[in-house]
A protein has these predicted regions:
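Intrinsically disordered, low-complexity terminal regions
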Residues: 1-246
Length: 246
């Protein structure tokens, strides 16, 4: 019995030492990693993709309209083994291993592709599009404290954002569909659209630039400002929400 107890204590002490050496803390929600050392760069091979799904604290720098030639990761050395980057059915997934989180800082990922059709983001992640994004349609699904900054020329852009997401758009499209709830901040005042459809609630603050029409509804204390010259508008407001031309 004493041998078993001693062996168990040795095992527990060993686990604690390993966790301490790797700076990994365990709790009921999983494992938290603290970055150690200066950031290094790692290059990984990936397959072709036209959709991105990103979770956790990643800063994605996406180059539009270039061939996919792998991706690079900039992070502390002790984080690399916990970073998952994989492509399945045309979707690039970027995340941490299950039940892991980072104590402080973001991981930078640089990647590009010829086309991009959809992006799904959750957590404290960001997407910065370098260059002009062109194509038929882009779907953006955002939640948590995610943020997007892009310039594009598209036929249609569909955005579904919740939480405390931030959105900055430049360029143009024919049809813009915006569904915003929570404390969303969206600046599309330099993103010229023909037709815009909105559903905005909570404390969301949205700026658009519609040249033909705006349709939709606002509730809560949300606000919508139109920097365009649209004249065929059908916007229903309730609560303390507001819609106005600038």
């Amino acid at each position: 019995m004493r041998k078993k107890i001693f062996a168990g204590l040795v095992g527990l002490i060993g686990t604690a030492l390993i966790a301490g050496a790797c700076n990994v803390k365990f709790d009921s929600k999983g494992k938290t990693i603290t970055p150690e050392g200066d950031a290094i760069t790692e290059t990984r091979d990936i397959g072709t993709f036209d959709r991105i799904d990103v979770e956790d604290a990643f800063a994605i720098h996406y180059k539009a309209g270039i061939p996919t030639d792998g991706l690079t990761i900039e992070a502390a050395p002790n984080l690399m083994e916990y970073i998952v980057t994989e492509v399945a059915n045309g979707e690039l997934s970027i995340r941490l291993k299950d039940r892991y989180s980072i104590h402080d800082g973001k991981i930078v990922v640089r990647v590009g592709s010829p086309t991009l059709k959809a992006v799904e983001m959750s957590g404290a992640c960001s997407l910065n599009v370098e260059g002009e994004l062109a194509g038929d349609r882009l779907d953006l699904d955002m939640s948590g404290a995610s943020s997007v900054n892009l310039t594009g020329r598209l036929r249609a852009l569909d955005i579904d954002a919740s939480g405390a997401s931030g959105i900055t758009l430049k360029g143009s499209c024919e049809e813009l569909t915006l569904s915003c709830s929570g404390a969303i901040g969206c600046d599309a005042s330099e993103f010229i659209t023909q037709r815009t459809e909105v559903s905005i609630s909570g404390t969301a603050s949205v700026k658009i630039n519609a040249s033909e029409s705006v349709r939709g509804n606002l509730s809560g204390i949300s606000s919508l400002e139109n920097y365009g010259a649209s004249s065929n508008d059908e916007v229903v407001t309730s609560g303390m929400s507001s819609y106005k031309h600038k």
